[in-house]
């Protein structure tokens, strides 16, 4: 666990975080110009062996010294983002407790380099932020993925109505859920973990999402009543069979992989 640094292309590593109060890391953010590193602690995979963290930490000297910056009840931090135009503006995705509900989850924002935090996106005490991305052309445009999950000693509920994708156009002041039922994205009790990314394609920034989906597929596809099937054939009288349209019978034979020697004319 912890955070490690290499200065020789991976031939050797030096631990940077061993003296801190957490061995599990959820996400890191490094500013290669200033030497500032942010570490969000706590593993987010939510397995039985996923250990909780102790909040978020900041170093301004490439990890030589660290300052704890709060969010002690976050337990599992999924993402740390920093505004490229103002390093004092920091966004943190907080997944929250694994084995219990708690209110310290969602998306948090700091305007003063981590001295204070405001919760800017909250779904419920069971749903936290599992991913968070920023539009590369506009840092005020944010997308957050919430995950409705809780683990018990005997069970893992890994999907729920609290899971979804949320979008902000104003730096997190307001949000809209863009994965609502009419959006085409899975939404409901079976929606699980979601991963997000954004990429420029043909001059436009496009968002991609991967989802662990347990929602049942809709069975509202209308059945073609005019098509001959085995159930109809089973209850058909000899007279009805004799009056069958040859095209319909031929299609039945081919759909059911009868040998080519059996045709509508021959049967």
PLM feature spans:
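Beta-propeller blade termini and top-face loops
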Residues: 1-267
């Amino acid at each position: 666990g912890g955070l490690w640094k290499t200065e020789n292309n991976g031939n050797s590593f030096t631990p940077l975080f061993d003296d801190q109060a957490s061995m599990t890391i959820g996400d890191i953010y490094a500013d290669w110009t200033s030497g500032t590193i942010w570490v969000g602690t706590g593993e987010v995979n939510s397995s039985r062996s996923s250990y909780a963290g102790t909040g978020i930490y900041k170093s301004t000297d490439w990890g030589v010294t660290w300052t704890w910056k709060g969010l002690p009840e976050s337990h599992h931090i999924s993402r740390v983002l920093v505004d490229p135009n103002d390093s004092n503006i920091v966004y943190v995705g907080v997944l929250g407790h694994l084995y219990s509900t708690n209110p310290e989850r969602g998306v948090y924002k700091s305007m003063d380099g981590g001295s204070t935090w405001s919760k800017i996106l909250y779904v419920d005490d069971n749903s936290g932020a599992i991913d968070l991305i920023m539009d590369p052309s506009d840092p005020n445009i944010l997308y957050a993925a919430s995950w409705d999950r809780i683990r018990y000693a005997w069970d893992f509920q890994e999907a729920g109505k609290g899971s979804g994708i949320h979008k902000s156009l104003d730096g997190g002041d307001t949000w809209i859920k863009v994965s609502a039922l009419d959006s085409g994205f899975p939404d409901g009790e079976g929606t699980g973990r979601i991963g997000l990314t954004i990429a420029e394609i043909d001059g436009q920034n496009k968002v991609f999402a991967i989802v662990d989906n347990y929602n049942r597929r809709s069975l509202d596809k209308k059945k073609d009543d005019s098509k001959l099937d085995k159930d109809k054939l089973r209850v058909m009288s000899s007279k009805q069979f004799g009056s069958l349209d040859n095209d319909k019978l031929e299609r039945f034979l081919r759909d059911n992989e009868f040998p080519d020697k059996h045709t509508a004319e021959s049967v």
